[in-house]
Amino acid sequence: MIFKQFFDNTSSTYTYLISSGKGREALIIDPVLENVETYIGYLKELDLKLVKVIDTHIHADHISGMAELRDKTNCVTIMGDKAPANVVAMKVADNESIKIENINIKALFTPGHTSESFCFLMNDRVFTGDTLLIKGTGRTDFQNGDARDAYNSIFNVLLKLPEDTKVYPAHDYKGETVSTIGEEKKLNPRLQVKSVDEYVNIMNNLNLPNPKMMDIAVPGNLNLGISLEKQKLSNGLEKKDFLMKIKDQNSLLIDLREKQEIEKDGKIEGGLEIPFTEINEYIKNNKAELLNKNLFFYCRVGHRSALAVQISKTYNLENSHHLIGGIKNLNL
């Protein structure tokens, strides 16, 4: 397995790249915009294909690199299901899985630092975002943070993991790179409290200044999605036109979501189910047949389908359209 930890000196942010090996698919957690070219250089060096990128929460101290990575690599952007509506292409709920090839990552809903914070568990390690830091915990005094929720997320979710589980946070300010659940139980000063009220009292009296980038980073990270206007420019169709045109005999309807999304949100009957991460290969292998078809893509909120139209055009498949706003726009 390839596991690479990157560090951003400006925001003290850790970014993680995961892959099962050279020439395989890759996933990135908590990328920083200014370091996107570094990530891409590493991907090229090891012949890796970036297919998914995750943010643990809406960051307040840096602009996320998710959108830039999406635009440069056609990867799927992912956050937990409490994130604002159209920030990312795919959302995962508590205990749902994110998969790339033989790697399985479990989403854990851990509100407290922010109301939408998630951690992500992969075998022997957990990516804790700003929820649990090394010998510290994430502040809870902005972005709908809540110290009581944070206590529950830490003590009743993260600290229930095996003690040898490695802890990889989104930040560190003292040069630490990794810890374990067992070490944090023993050595983290904020975890030595005797009650939730004691923890809440500590967190509510930190009196820290707001992050320097907060007024720029939060609005920026809330607008990472592909806007409806941009979706329209990518041969986007409003739902009435879309539902009418897919009835044509020469049309081919393609659902770009993953199986768990389809099971959760329903689907339009009669289409192919091809996850977005496989659509380039599908088009390449079936180009001759598809040249005579009108392609109609859809996904959850229109991000992946807009990108699928762009991919189709690289194969000269000009009769490609997609559903603006995705299946969420259909209110099934």
What is the meaning of each model-derived region?
Residues 1-49, 119-129, 135, 258:
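Conserved beta-strand hairpin/beta-sheet module of binuclear metal-dependent hydrolase folds
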Residues 12, 23-26, 33-109:
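Active-site HxH/HxHxD metal-binding segment of metal-dependent hydrolases
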Residues 17, 97-122, 160:
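Core dinuclear metal-dependent hydrolase active-site scaffold
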Residues 31, 58, 82-83, 113-114, ...:
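Active-site metal-binding loops of divalent metal-dependent hydrolases
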Residues 53-63, 110-115, 167-174, 301:
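Histidine-centered catalytic micro-motifs
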Residues 108, 274, 283-332:
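Catalytic cysteine-centered active loop of the rhodanese-like fold, especially the PTP/DSP P-loop
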Residues 152-166, 170-251, 259:
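Accessory terminal helices/loops
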Residues 226-295, 328:
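Positively charged, proline/Ser/Thr-rich regional signature most characteristic
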